[in-house]
Amino acid sequence: MLTSFKLHSLKPYTLKSSMILEIITYILCFFSMIIAFVDNTFSIKIYNITAIVCLLSLILRGRQENYNIKNLILPLSIFLIGLLDLIWYSAFKVDNSPFRATYHSYLNTAKIFIFGSFIVFLTLTSQLKSKKESVLYTLYSLSFLIAGYAMYINSIHENDRISFGVGTATGAAYSTMLIGIVSGVAILYTKKNHPFLFLLNSCAVLYVLALTQTRATLLLFPIICVAALIAYYNKSPKKFTSSIVLLIAILASIVIIFNKPIQNRYNEALNDLNSYTNANSVTSLGARLAMYEIGLNIFIKSPFSFRSAESRAESMNLLVAEHNRLRGALEFSNVHLHNEIIEAGSLKGLMGIFSTLFLYFSLFYIAYKKRALGLLILTLGIVGIGLSDVIIWARSIPIIIISAIVLLLVINNRNNTIN
């Protein structure tokens, strides 16, 4: 009886502590996302602290009424990817492997996604409601800060593709686009949600993408912008029409300003495709197409099997020995196959493909159930990039993905009470 009374009297304090830790979790998610943009090593440390704070918050909170299957689907899909990556790593990693980098990247993804499943679950079951718009304006400023930083880097290395701190220009482009989506969507949740402010943000993002010269994002991001405008302004034809006209003007301006590098990248793409049709895949696009063909071939031969990075590389070499036109793919045998589905299938078989599709489905499902249009836009970005590259891999971009999901769910909770 006395014990029951003590527990009851302590409950308000534990709940308050849980709420404080939850707020700290979201703040750390914000910093994890930003730091991942420039420093892989430090970002994983901040992310690990975020996960610990999240777990403490969940423990102190106790069971909630909204702990249901609806709110478990997305965390489960994230956890499944992390678990499969961990199983794959444990089954095949050996000392002194020539594919150490590949194994290490999957181990990092496993940790990030397993921890991330708990952070996303905390967010989906959150009872916190805040009407402060200062947070939204802080998020909105991110794209402009990135654009300013990119301008500074470009002034020093004028003719180079900028890469920030994530290793490659392509990685910088993906990171910029994902953070840019969070930044742009944030302004749409404010009272001053005029499409001009969203498009101003889009202009900053497109400027950075043009500096990275990454074709996939330069094609994908305008489509995502149109999808966002349709989702948010479909009931206001005047705003929608004016915003589309302004978006076209922005795109035209970007093309004019960056005409030379864009034209060069376009010509390179045409040359790559021409080379591929002439049995030469040792080009950027040609290597991708060769990887897709090889990856599908490896999967079809053994669709139910997990296979090591060494085994996949051996299969790639055998296929290239038979079909020399696919030799461009060999350069990436110690990286990945530049498509989420094909990469997952080539190493983890049907289970790998299922886990990736389950994640995509879960993101769309939660976006629909929570009426989270921001999450829908982010999901389109994740799926779109996954068609031509692998981003559920390594450290920086997985951290940005999890953090972006969390932050978009947090700001969506301002307007929705659906659980």
UniProtKB/Swiss-Prot annotation:
InterPro entries recorded: O-antigen_ligase-rel_domated, WaaL-like
Assigned EC number: 2.4.99.26
Keyword Transferase: yes
Phenotype caused by lack of the gene: Deletion of the gene has no appreciable effect on the LPS profiles. Deletion prevents formation of M(LPS) when colanic acid synthesis is induced.
Result of changing D272A: Leads to a reduced O-antigen surface expression
Residue spans, topological domain Cytoplasmic: 1-19, 62-71, 126-134, 188-194, 235-240, 368-372, 413-419
Any one Pfam family match given in the protein's UniProt record, by short name: Wzy_C
Induction data: Expressed in both exponential and stationary phase in rich medium (at protein level).
Location in the cell: Cell inner membrane
Regulation: Activity does not require ATP and magnesium ions.
Subunit structure: Homodimer.
Name listed for the protein in its UniProt record: O-antigen ligase
Source taxonomy: Bacteria, Pseudomonadati, Pseudomonadota, Gammaproteobacteria, Enterobacterales
